[in-house]
């Protein structure tokens, strides 16, 4: 059985559109895989006939297979009874069917790999990208069918391994694991190509729509049949006679016929006596607007009441930025602040004079204190003066 060639190899650009191999009927309970009656064992010569690949591509494929393919699974030599040495016919037939299914799946995945490389080669216009998305969806459906066959083959191989020798199962497990890895790699590449094609088709679709808009604008730039401004058509806008008078845009209190409209003053406020805006009082809208204005005025009073404690706190201890904001440059300083500045100036001069006069008056005091504190001895004789 041939392992998968490296995914990074380049193959000729001929498209491969051959149908998938016929799926096999799995009989896991009986321990065998029954091939379809019309199906035969796939071989490298059948690859060239089914895929339609050129001879140099098949040469590369054969060289790759000879370099990377493991040896065939041992049939009669490794599956013998330990007591009598007779080969187990049931196990041998299961391994033969498993090997044939493995070859068929390898060819199927190889064909899907070629088709995926065909789709990955290059992207052209938006139409080509859209067609490739359709081809990719068909390829994805075929790959799902192949993945189901691989899963069934793995399940059958696990059941067969329970009745075979450990050495034979080791080689079988290695081959089946390679098939699963190849399947996962193709799925991953297919998902990457799907995301690339979708993003590319969206970009090309936007560019195509932009080109169509530019073509339409370019066609409409030239003068029409009726001249530069086009053919004349009756306007759908209303004439001045059909326009209605809007009281919101009235200036001077005049109605639609130029007559003076009598205005009704609004209700006075219970707190400050303010009267709201005047209205004609002829419709329901005027009454509603008066009531709404009165409610807004009362809400403003309520907000002022809530703000008064905060304003008092700010007036008691104003911060430096607030005091700076309150000063107006164009207005001179009030006269009440001048005595305060004079008082601070006199206080400063008084302190300076006191500091100058204190050292002069403190010289004598310090001298008396020093004399009083100077220690001296007083000698007193009890029996008189000593003899000379």
From Swiss-Prot:
Keywords: Disulfide bond, Membrane, Nucleus, Transmembrane, Transmembrane helix. This is Nesprin-4. One of its GO terms (biological process) is establishment of epithelial cell apical/basal polarity. As a component of the LINC (LInker of Nucleoskeleton and Cytoskeleton) complex, involved in the connection between the nuclear lamina and the cytoskeleton. The nucleocytoplasmic interactions established by the LINC complex play an important role in the transmission of mechanical forces across the nuclear envelope and in nuclear movement and positioning. Behaves as a kinesin cargo, providing a functional binding site for kinesin-1 at the nuclear envelope. Residues 1-339 are cytoplasmic. Core component of LINC complexes which are composed of inner nuclear membrane SUN domain-containing proteins coupled to outer nuclear membrane KASH domain-containing nesprins. SUN and KASH domain-containing proteins seem to bind each other promiscuously; however, differentially expression of LINC complex constituents can give rise to specific assemblies. Probably part of a SUN1-containing LINC complex. Interacts with kinesins KIF5B and KLC1. The disulfid bond with SUN1 or SUN2 is required for stability of the respective LINC complex under tensile forces. Disruption phenotype: Mice are born at the expected Mendelian rate and look overtly normal. In the cochlea, outer hair cells form, but appear to degenerate as hearing matures. Inner hair cells remain intact. Hearing loss is already detected at P15 and progresses at all frequencies by P60. One of its GO terms (cellular component) is meiotic nuclear membrane microtubule tethering complex. Residues 60-92 are annotated as: Disordered. The KASH domain, which contains a transmembrane domain, mediates the nuclear envelope targeting and is involved in the binding to SUN1 and SUN2 through recognition of their SUN domains. It is a single-pass type IV membrane protein. Its main location: nucleus. The chain crosses the membrane at residues 340-360. Residues 361-388 are perinuclear space. Expressed in secretory epithelial cells, such as those found in exocrine pancreas, bulbourethral gland, mammary gland and salivary gland (at protein level). Also expressed in the cochlea, where it is restricted primarily to the 3 rows of outer hair cells and 1 row of inner hair cells (at protein level). Not detected in other cells of the cochlea, including Deiter's cells and pillar cells, nor in liver and kidney (at protein level). Residues 331-388 form the KASH domain. Belongs to the nesprin family. The keyword Transmembrane helix applies. It is found in: Nucleus outer membrane. It comes from Mus musculus (Mouse). Residues 78-92 have a biased composition (Basic and acidic residues).
């Amino acid at each position: 059985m041939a392992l998968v060639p490296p995914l990074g190899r380049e193959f000729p650009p001929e498209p491969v559109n051959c149908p998938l191999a016929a799926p096999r009927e799995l009989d896991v309970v009986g321990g065998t895989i029954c091939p379809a009656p019309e199906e035969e064992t796939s071989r490298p010569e059948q690859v060239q006939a089914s895929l339609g690949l050129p001879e140099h591509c098949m040469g590369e494929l054969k060289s790759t297979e000879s370099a990377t393919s493991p040896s065939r699974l041992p049939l009669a030599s490794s599956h013998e009874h330990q007591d009598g040495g007779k080969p187990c016919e049931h196990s041998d037939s299961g391994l033969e069917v498993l090997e044939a299914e493995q070859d068929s799946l390898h060819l199927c995945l190889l064909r899907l790999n070629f088709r995926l490389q065909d789709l990955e080669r290059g992207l052209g216009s938006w139409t080509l990208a859209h067609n490739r998305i359709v081809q990719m969806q068909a390829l994805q459906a075929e790959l799902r069918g192949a993945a189901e066959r691989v899963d069934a083959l793995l399940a059958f191989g696990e059941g067969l391994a329970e009745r075979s020798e450990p050495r034979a199962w080791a080689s079988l497990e290695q081959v089946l694991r390679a098939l699963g890895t190849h399947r996962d790699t193709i799925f991953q590449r297919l998902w990457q190509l799907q995301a690339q094609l979708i993003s590319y088709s969206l970009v090309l679709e936007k560019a195509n729509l932009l080109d169509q808009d530019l073509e339409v604008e370019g066609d409409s730039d030239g003068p029409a049949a009726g001249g530069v401004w086009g053919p004349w058509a009756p306007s759908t806008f209303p004439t001045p006679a059909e326009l209605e008078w809007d009281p919101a845009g009235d200036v001077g209190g005049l109605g639609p016929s130029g007559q003076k409209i009598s205005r009704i003053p609004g209700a006075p406020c219970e707190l400050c006596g303010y009267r709201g805006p005047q209205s004609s009082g002829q419709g329901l809208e005027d009454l509603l607007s008066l009531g709404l204005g009165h409610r807004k005025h009362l809400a403003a009073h309520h907000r002022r009441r809530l703000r008064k404690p905060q304003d008092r706190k700010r007036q008691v201890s104003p911060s430096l930025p607030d005091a700076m904001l309150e000063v107006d440059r164009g207005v001179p300083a009030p006269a009440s602040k001048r005595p305060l500045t004079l008082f601070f100036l006199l206080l400063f001069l008084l302190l300076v004079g006191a500091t100058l006069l204190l050292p002069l008056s403190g010289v004598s005091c310090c001298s008396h204190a020093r004399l009083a504190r100077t220690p001296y001895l007083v000698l007193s004789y009890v029996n008189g003066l000593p003899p000379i």
